[in-house]
């Protein structure tokens, strides 16, 4: 239902945010930003 699709959207958005944070952190550590 609607709640399930909202949950799926939140999970997908959360993954995207986590991945961008991780890539930003790793490039800063490696000084490749």
Curated annotation (Swiss-Prot):
Disulfide bonds: 27-33
Family: Belongs to the frog skin active peptide (FSAP) family. Brevinin subfamily.
InterPro entries: Antimicrobial_frog_2
Lineage of source species: Eukaryota, Metazoa, Chordata, Craniata, Vertebrata
Name of the protein described by the UniProt record: Brevinin-2
Subcellular localization: Secreted
Tissue-specificity statement: Expressed by the skin glands.
Domain of life: Eukaryota
Protein purpose: Shows antibacterial activity against representative Gram-negative and Gram-positive bacterial species, and a very high hemolytic activity.
Presence of the UniProt keyword Ribonucleoprotein in the record: no
An annotated GO cellular component: extracellular region
Native organism: Pelophylax porosus brevipodus (Nagoya Daruma pond frog)
């Amino acid at each position: 239902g609607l709640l399930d699709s909202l949950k799926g959207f939140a999970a997908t958005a959360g993954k995207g945010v986590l991945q961008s944070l991780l890539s930003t952190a790793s490039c800063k550590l490696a000084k490749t930003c």
